[in-house]
UniProtKB/Swiss-Prot annotation:
Name by which UniProt lists this protein: Matrix protein 1
Record keywords, A-Z: Host nucleus, Membrane, RNA-binding, Viral matrix protein, Virion
Pfam families given in the database record: Flu_M1 (PF00598), Flu_M1_C (PF08289)
Main localisation: virion
Function: Plays critical roles in virus replication, from virus entry and uncoating to assembly and budding of the virus particle. M1 binding to ribonucleocapsids (RNPs) in nucleus seems to inhibit viral transcription. Interaction of viral NEP with M1-RNP is thought to promote nuclear export of the complex, which is targeted to the virion assembly site at the apical plasma membrane in polarized epithelial cells. Interactions with NA and HA may bring M1, a non-raft-associated protein, into lipid rafts. Forms a continuous shell on the inner side of the lipid bilayer in virion, where it binds the RNP. Determines the virion's shape: spherical or filamentous. Clinical isolates of influenza are characterized by the presence of significant proportion of filamentous virions, whereas after multiple passage on eggs or cell culture, virions have only spherical morphology. Filamentous virions are thought to be important to infect neighboring cells, and spherical virions more suited to spread through aerosol between hosts organisms.
Keyword RNA-binding: yes
Annotated compartments: Virion membrane; Host nucleus
Repeat found in the keyword field: no
Gene: M
Sequence motif Nuclear localization signal, residues: 101-105
Entry similarity comment: Belongs to the influenza viruses Matrix protein M1 family.
Gene Ontology molecular function: any one: structural constituent of virion
GO aspect biological process, one term: viral budding from plasma membrane
Amino acid sequence: MSLLTEVETYVLSIVPSGPLKAEIAQRLEDVFAGKNTDLEALMEWLKTRPILSPLTKGILGFVFTLTVPSERGLQRRRFVQNALNGNGDPNNMDRAVKLYRKLKREITFHGAKEVALSYSTGALASCMGLIYNRMGTVTTEVAFGLVCATCEHIADSQHRSHRQMVTTTNPLIRHENRMVLASTTAKAMEQMAGSSEQAAEAMEVASQARQMVQAMRTIGTHPSSSAGLKDDLLENLQAYQKRMGVQMQRFK
């Protein structure tokens, strides 16, 4: 896996699924391919994106700044600085300085990532802040190692909370989660249908699923009644995709 592919993988792992994730993936690909060279416009776009947490915006802003060539005197952005200040905790700043000194001795992406993984997310964010504010310099490769270690910490905690939801024994939460997933799947089917010949069929399946979820929410049903709904929908979507020759990539 190339370095930039690895960075894209880690960064996207902390972005919530949805149309915005696909949009961010496209921007990252363009930036890494050297197709997008307007850092100012890119940062303005990032600043106004909904849904993303301040820290995720800060990390993306840091990655864009590292990658897009820019004028020496280009102003640093406040929304990135605020996100990368380690919650204003002086302990995070102390640890960030220690980490920075260690990173100065590293020359490889993997070496930097290994060193960074033993620090907390707050310390890692503060260390990124140091570099972003030009208080310290490391190679781009080492900075990317720091980014990926931070994303791994965030993705780990997201995965833990996701796993808690999936394994929860509370039937009401499981039921609601299945209905939300069914609605999301229906939306994906409608987006993929486009203007193809099978579009009508996909829209029909998606529409039925929506109506069923709406009915379940309106009249209230037994929590176990939604169990088959999401699976049926996913099965229909996969069959439809196979006929269309579409890969199950970004959707998984």
